[in-house]
Swiss-Prot record:
Chief localization: cytoplasm
Superkingdom as given in the UniProt entry: Bacteria
GO biological process, one term: protein folding
Compartments (UniProt record): Cytoplasm, Cytosol
The protein's name in its UniProt record: Flagellar protein FliT
Oligomeric form and interacting partners: Homodimer. Interacts with FliD and FlhC.
Gene3D superfamilies, per database record: Flagellar protein flit (1.20.58.380)
Function, in words: Dual-function protein that regulates the transcription of class 2 flagellar operons and that also acts as an export chaperone for the filament-capping protein FliD. As a transcriptional regulator, acts as an anti-FlhDC factor; it directly binds FlhC, thus inhibiting the binding of the FlhC/FlhD complex to class 2 promoters, resulting in decreased expression of class 2 flagellar operons. As a chaperone, effects FliD transition to the membrane by preventing its premature polymerization, and by directing it to the export apparatus.
GO cellular component, one term: cytosol
TM ranges: none
C-alpha cells in the first residue's frame, strides 16, 4: 500500500493547523489557540506514525521540506507571541499582588486607599 499521498496530505493538514494557530495567536484568541493545540499534536503524531511506516523518497522529502520550514516558522512566531502574553500576564499578576498587599495593609484604617491604575492602552 502506497502511503506517500496520505503522508503528503497529512503534512498539508498540519500546515493548515499551524497557520490557524498562528492566526489565533496573532489575534490574541488564547482560549481558541489552546483548544486547537490537541488537533495539532494529533496531526504531528499521525505524521510520525506514517513516516515510520514508509521511508519517504528523496523526491518526497524535497516536496515536504517547504512545508516543514513553514510549520517551524509558524511555531516560532506562535512561541514569540505566547512569550509576550506570558510577560503581560506576569506583569498583571505582579500588579494584582501589589494591590492586594496595599489593600491588606491599609484597608482596615477606614480611609481611602489609592491603588495603582492599569495604564495599558
Amino acid at each position: 500500500m502506497n502511503h506517500a499521498p496520505h503522508l503528503y496530505f497529512a503534512w498539508q493538514q498540519l500546515v493548515e493547523k499551524s497557520q490557524l494557530m498562528l492566526r489565533l495567536a496573532t489575534e490574541e484568541q488564547w482560549d481558541e489557540l489552546i483548544a486547537s493545540e490537541m488537533a495539532y499534536v494529533n496531526a504531528v503524531q499521525e505524521i510520525a506514525h506514517l513516516t515510520e511506516e514508509i521511508d519517504p523518497s528523496t523526491t518526497m522529502q524535497e516536496q515536504l521540506r517547504p512545508m516543514l520550514r513553514l510549520i517551524l516558522d509558524n511555531e516560532s512566531k506562535v512561541k514569540q507571541l505566547l512569550q509576550i502574553r506570558m510577560d503581560e500576564l506576569a506583569k498583571l499578576v505582579g500588579q494584582s499582588s501589589v494591590q492586594k498587599s496595599v489593600l491588606s495593609a491599609y484597608g482596615d484604617q477606614g480611609g481611602f486607599v489609592l491603588a495603582p491604575q492599569d495604564n495599558f492602552s
